């Protein structure tokens, strides 16, 4: 009888932990309101922590294998204007897909950047970051794309979180578009 009770308690505990992990996996990694809740110590930080002046849109495309999709957040006026926009490629951390960083991507795009990410669960080689940039560069040369001649290829940056930090170094030193 005691063994049965211990078994039930163990089963319930496992189910509660599983439910908690499922709930946590559904939350964004960067809270949607982070630009309003983070406190800074200076005027410059306060200025750039706020959202920029651009409305933001998002485009997606299918990516190979585990990468699932490429995502680009961009200033909405990109679709109608003649300007080009600097690019930020973001390499996500282990098991934290780019879709968990939407608030960060929207924030950067509101300041006039094209921000790229993908769903790669293991970014360390930099290959998925490079492929995501290659996708945008292909779109930049495609007259049928919203990104046609919109990416400022002289101003491309890369950033990463956790394992994505390693991906940054590998993307710029080991991947085909590292020299950009």
Describe the residue ranges of each PLM region.
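N-terminal cap/lid segment of alpha/beta-hydrolase-fold proteins
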Residues: 28-84
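Short amphipathic alpha-helix adjacent to the substrate-entry channel of hydrolases
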Residues: 99-118
């Amino acid at each position: 009888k005691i063994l049965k009770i211990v078994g039930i308690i163990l089963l319930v505990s496992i189910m509660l932990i599983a439910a908690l992990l499922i709930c946590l996996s559904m939350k964004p990694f960067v809270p949607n309101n982070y630009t309003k809740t983070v406190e800074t110590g200076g005027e410059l930080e306060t200025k750039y922590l706020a959202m920029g002046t651009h409305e933001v849109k998002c485009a997606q495309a299918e990516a190979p294998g585990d990468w699932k999709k490429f995502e680009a957040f961009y200033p909405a006026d990109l679709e109608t204007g003649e300007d080009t926009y600097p690019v930020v490629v973001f390499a996500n951390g282990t098991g934290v897909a780019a879709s968990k960083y939407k608030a960060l991507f929207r924030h950067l795009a509101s300041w006039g950047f094209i921000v790229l990410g993908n769903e790669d669960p293991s970014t360390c080689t930099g290959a998925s970051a490079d492929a995501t940039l290659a996708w945008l560069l292909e779109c930049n040369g495609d007259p049928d794309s919203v990104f046609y001649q919109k990416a400022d290829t002289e101003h491309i940056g890369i950033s990463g979180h956790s394992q994505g930090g390693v991906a940054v170094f590998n993307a710029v030193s080991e991947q085909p578009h590292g020299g950009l």
